[in-house]
Every structure is written in structure tokens, then in C-alpha cells.
């Protein structure tokens, strides 16, 4: 479009200029310094190939950008050289005087951060070695620190105000029952260590005797003493230091007879019920209690190593968590990789998919009912109307008998069969009841078909078969044309009432409606619409000539008096627009025959009627005439009455 071959060439003089105009970041510093700006300007001013104005503008933009880059780089280089020269060659500078031998020179590398900045290379999936990385992965138990928190604090054992001094130290409880640690963090005990733990617990249990009696009993037991901070400054502080008072919790006894000590002891080993405590109260009374021996007490069995925490499972090497191997996708290649021209043309010409029936729901419920009831199967089983009575519908279906169609079955045999009902016979046509004559004479039929009299009054154009108005003979007798005089008209019987209505009063136009008369018969109405009427186009010429004569008679009186007449006086007797149009058409007919001349000074203005060249020849038209052929034709010819639209 705008490119030239020398511009797109990689080694061309304007290649870098074009690239600088469209992709400035693509050029390096070396390429910018290599570009010869004067030579590029010369190539643009005097090109070897004619270039478009837009291409020249792009090249000039590239030259400006390259020149701007060059000046920027030159300014940066000169500034850097100036700073170095200013630091190294200032006045009186010398290494011996200014800088000692062991002094450290503080160098500012802020300007060289970008130069010495090391970018970490991108990590690619191809460099990922799973075996090398997974070899350094340790177990979760090996890298997790052991918890040294005393979980016995949760039971408020170390609280000085929660007990009566016989709970023991926390280190003793840890020694007896072990620290409450998560099972996943406990080391797996060996059989030798388990025996030692059991031996230590038996010795500690013999030193501290625990006895279960009633809920309300008070037990004094010997064992390791603990300073009772609650009773040191109160009454009861005279208890022996080696004696501890323990009151069992009645709530725990009611729930099942398990006290706090029983909870701890039941975690590791069964409760031992053979301890006896001999205590002496402050009154010197000795109490000797017999231990409560249950009847069936099973001997304690040694703890198995499986009762402690098990070895943590290696989730990665479990059978159920095996890595699912993905199936290699099978590459499917088409057997035919190319489409032939014949197949392509056949596919383009195939329009069978557009000829399918569209299966869409009808837009309205009425259309839906028509689609259902208009089906062929529905029509062969159901009547045309809706029948809600099931019994009546079944009777209708019984009458539906199918017969095989026989081509030799003629219509005569069909009419003679019993299944042909009289109601199916052809009825008489309405014009046959009126005794209309269907036989039309050949000479009249050759001239053209009968014309509807209702539309004859509206016709404003001249047909080829009609006699033009200008060819009329405006002689002394103003007779009809020659063809009209010798035309034989078939006599048409007319009723007296209708004939009286068809007579026109020449003194004053009387436009009557034949359909408004109560005396008109059906035959007269059909004749008005063209049924049985034998009138032709030639009768229309006589009709228009009679109207023109009537208009000329109206106008001649005003012309003889004042020399001119107005068209508004002619249309004063018109009752509707149709009658006014007929009068205007008759006026134009007279003007065309030069009987009168019309003039209109402005659009939609008054039409002035003046006498024409043949006015005197047409004026005797208004005088009485002897009875002749013309009067005979006038009396014998029926005129169609005017009807309002």
C-alpha cells in the first residue's frame, strides 16, 4: 500500500528509519549509532522510487526519532565523562597527599546498579528434576519440633487453689501418666522401654495408695507430700505434713464413680483397689478401713506395643493413592485430507437442509388448534366441528367407511348410486330463476364483453373502440355519429317503474338511485350490475354527447347575456363529487370540439367559459328540433341513471 521495496529490504538505507517510526524499542543502541542520518535524509528527499506522501511522513518521523536518540546518548556520554574528569583531575589532587595508603575509598555504585544487576533466570518445567528434588524431602515427624508444653495445666492441676494438696507435682504426673502429646509426635516405644515404664508406675502406685469407698468418705493416704498453701494460714494447718486430705468429687461419683485420679489411671492401666490407709486424726483416733474388694476382677494384662502410637503412614507410597497413569491419546488422522472439486461443488449445491419442515410451536393457541385439527389423520377420524359427546363421536366414526378408488367408476355411475343424496345435486343459478338471456348476438360479442354499468359512470379515459368526441358532427341537427345511427340495439324489456326513473329531466338534472326505489325488481338490480345487459361502448358515446348538450344549453344563456359564464354556476346543481367530475369532463369535451373556450387565471381559481369558434354552429342545439332519427334514438336509447358513490 504505502511500502516500497527498498524500504522493506533489511540492508536498505531506510530500513532502520522505517523501523524507528513504527517500533522504536526494537532498535538497539548500536543500531542507532550505525544509522547515517544525512544519508537517510538524502534518500527521502531524492528517492529512487516514487513514494506516497504518507510513506515520506513515516520516514521523516523515524529520522527525527533516531536523531533524538543519538543526541540523548551523546549527552549522557559527555555528562559521564565530565563527572569522571571532575573527580579524578581536580586541582591539587595526588594519591600521596590526599589519600593514605591504608585508606578505603568509598565508591558510589548507585549509577551502576542497573549495569551489575543480576536477573534470576526463568524457571522452566524442562529443568525440573523430580528425583533430585524429592531426595531432599524429609519426613514430617523428623522436621517437626516436639511440644514441651505441659498439657496437664488444662485440668488445673498446678493451680494452688484448686486442690487439697494431694494432686502431686506436675513432673510426677508427667512421670506417672506421661505428657499429653499428639499421637503423631510421640516416638514409637520399644519393648525394653515399655517394661521400664511399667515398673516405674508400679513403684509409684505402691507409694501413693488410692482407695475408692463411698462418695462421702474421706481418705488419708501416705505418699509424696506437697505443701498445702491453702491451709497453712488457716485452721486445719495442724495436719501432718506427710498426710494429705482428699475429698472425692460427689458429682463424679454420681456419674459413674470415677474421680480425677481414676480418669488418669484408667488411661494407662487398670485401677488398683487393694490399698489400705491407716491414718490418725487430730483427736488421736485410729481408723482401720478394710479395702473394698470387687468379686470379679480380671488381672491386669501387660500393655502391648500396638496400644501406643503407631508408625505414621507414608501417604505417598500407599496403594490407594497411586498416581493415575494417563492414557496416551491416539492420534486420529483423516483418511481423506483433501476435498475434491466435485465433492465441494456437490456440497455447495445441496440445499436439502433448508427444505426440512421447521418444528416450531405455533405463536397462538388458535394456530395450534388449527395445526392439530388440520392433520390428515385428524380429519379422517374427527368431524369438522368440535364434538364433546363421546357417544356421538363414536357413532360418527362408525360411518367412516373407506373404499378403494376405481378409475373406471364414472360420474354417471356415481350419480346413479344410492349414496348420492339429492342434497348434493347442483342447484339452479340465481340468474336462471330470473329468466336472463344467456345467448348473446355474435356481432355484439365480437365487440367485447358486457361492461358493468356501475363502473361505466366512473370511466374517465377513452378506449380505442369508442368514438372520440372531436369527431362528432355538430351539424344542423346535431345527430349522433354514423355508427350509432345504424347500430341495431336489442330491445330490453323494462318495467314501468324503472323506465320512469331512467328518464332524465332536461330542465333540471334529477340524479336518482335505482337501488333506493321500492318498485325496482331483482332483475333490474342484476341488470344494473351487468347481468343480462347487452349495452356496448357505443352507447357511452351517445350518453356523453347528451351530457355535453345539456352543459352547453346551461352555458349558452349566460354567454348570450354577459358574454361569458362561470363553471361554478354549472356545478351548482351537482350533489356530489362524482357529478361535478362528469360535468367537468363534458365541459372539456365541448372545449375540445371548439364549441366553447375555457380560461383559468390561477391554480384552483374560477374557470371562465367563453364562446368558441364553433359556438354558433352548436347553439341551434338548444332550439326545438323536428322529430327525426336523432330524436328517435334519444327516446329509444336507455340511459343508465347516475348513482352516488
From Swiss-Prot:
Record-given protein name: Sister chromatid cohesion protein 1
Annotated organism of origin: Caenorhabditis elegans
GO cellular component, one term: cytoplasm
Phenotype when the gene is knocked out: Postembryonic RNAi-mediated knock-down results in either larval arrest, or adult sterility with a protruding vulva phenotype. Worms have defective chromosome segregation.
Subcellular location: Nucleus; Chromosome; Cytoplasm
Biological process according to GO: cell division; establishment of mitotic sister chromatid cohesion; meiotic cell cycle; replication-born double-strand break repair via sister chromatid exchange; sister chromatid cohesion; synaptonemal complex assembly
Keywords: Cell cycle, Cell division, Chromosome, Cytoplasm, Mitosis, Nucleus
GO molecular function, one term: damaged DNA binding
Keyword Nucleus: yes
Function according to Swiss-Prot or TrEMBL: Cleavable component of the cohesin complex involved in chromosome cohesion during cell cycle. The cohesin complex is required for the cohesion of sister chromatids after DNA replication. The cohesin complex apparently forms a large proteinaceous ring within which sister chromatids can be trapped. At metaphase-anaphase transition, this protein is cleaved and dissociates from chromatin, allowing sister chromatids to segregate.
The encoding gene: scc-1
